[in-house]
Amino acid sequence: MENFNQIFTLLAENEGIGLNTDILETGIINIAALVGILIYAGRDFLGSFLEQRKTSIVQGVQDAEGRLEEANRRLSEAQKQLSQAHIVISEIKNETISAKKVLLESDAYQAKKDLTTRFSRALATFRSKERQIFLEVKEQIILLVLKRTVARAQQTFGPKERATALITETINKLEGDLL
């Protein structure tokens, strides 16, 4: 860019930019003669070359138009197939949804049935454990009461035989009533 600026600066300082009107000095006559000779001598060659070029261009355009028509035809066929595929996909979706509904309903019924069975089993197990714990607690309370009663009776009556017989008889009666 700097060189470009220097060229214009030199031209502006020295002579400036101008038009050379001397025909002999510029070589315009030589260029015109050369172009004339080329046209005269190369007319047949250039004409046939241009004709071949024109023919190849026309052929290329016709081929391109044929390919365009073929591509348009294939595009329309592909669009038809796409619309048919969309119809098939929507039918498959509808069938899938209805099948899901049927499966969910049957699964829900089976799950409800399984849940009811499991709940019944859990409830029976709970009641069985509750009854077992109740009996164990009852047995422990009876043993504790009997031990305390024996201890109090021994303190009250001492080691006498009659007291022992009375206590044993009372314990046997209580055991029979509680069990």
Swiss-Prot record:
<comment type="subunit">
    <text>F-type ATPases have 2 components, F(1) - the catalytic core - and F(0) - the membrane proton channel. F(1) has five subunits: alpha(3), beta(3), gamma(1), delta(1), epsilon(1). F(0) has four main subunits: a(1), b(1), b'(1) and c(10-14). The alpha and beta chains form an alternating ring which encloses part of the gamma chain. F(1) is attached to F(0) by a central stalk formed by the gamma and epsilon chains, while a peripheral stalk is formed by the delta, b and b' chains.</text>
</comment>
<keyword id="KW-0472">Membrane</keyword>
<feature type="transmembrane region" description="Helical">
    <location>
        <begin position="28"/>
        <end position="46"/>
    </location>
</feature>
<keyword id="KW-0547">Nucleotide-binding</keyword>
<keyword id="KW-0406">Ion transport</keyword>
<comment type="similarity">
    <text>Belongs to the ATPase B chain family.</text>
</comment>
<keyword id="KW-0793">Thylakoid</keyword>
<protein>
    <recommendedName>
        <fullName>ATP synthase subunit b, chloroplastic</fullName>
    </recommendedName>
</protein>
<keyword id="KW-0812">Transmembrane</keyword>
<keyword id="KW-0138">CF(0)</keyword>
<keyword id="KW-0066">ATP synthesis</keyword>
<keyword id="KW-0375">Hydrogen ion transport</keyword>
<comment type="function">
    <text>Component of the F(0) channel, it forms part of the peripheral stalk, linking F(1) to F(0).</text>
</comment>
<keyword id="KW-0067">ATP-binding</keyword>
<keyword id="KW-0934">Plastid</keyword>
<dbReference type="GO" id="GO:0046933">
    <property type="term" value="F:proton-transporting ATP synthase activity, rotational mechanism"/>
</dbReference>
<dbReference type="Pfam" id="PF00430">
    <property type="entry name" value="ATP-synt_B"/>
</dbReference>
<keyword id="KW-0150">Chloroplast</keyword>
<comment type="function">
    <text>F(1)F(0) ATP synthase produces ATP from ADP in the presence of a proton or sodium gradient. F-type ATPases consist of two structural domains, F(1) containing the extramembraneous catalytic core and F(0) containing the membrane proton channel, linked together by a central stalk and a peripheral stalk. During catalysis, ATP synthesis in the catalytic domain of F(1) is coupled via a rotary mechanism of the central stalk subunits to proton translocation.</text>
</comment>
<keyword id="KW-0813">Transport</keyword>
<dbReference type="GO" id="GO:0005524">
    <property type="term" value="F:ATP binding"/>
</dbReference>
<dbReference type="InterPro" id="IPR002146">
    <property type="entry name" value="ATP_synth_b/b'su_bac/chlpt"/>
</dbReference>
<dbReference type="GO" id="GO:0009535">
    <property type="term" value="C:chloroplast thylakoid membrane"/>
</dbReference>
<dbReference type="GO" id="GO:0045259">
    <property type="term" value="C:proton-transporting ATP synthase complex"/>
</dbReference>
<keyword id="KW-1133">Transmembrane helix</keyword>
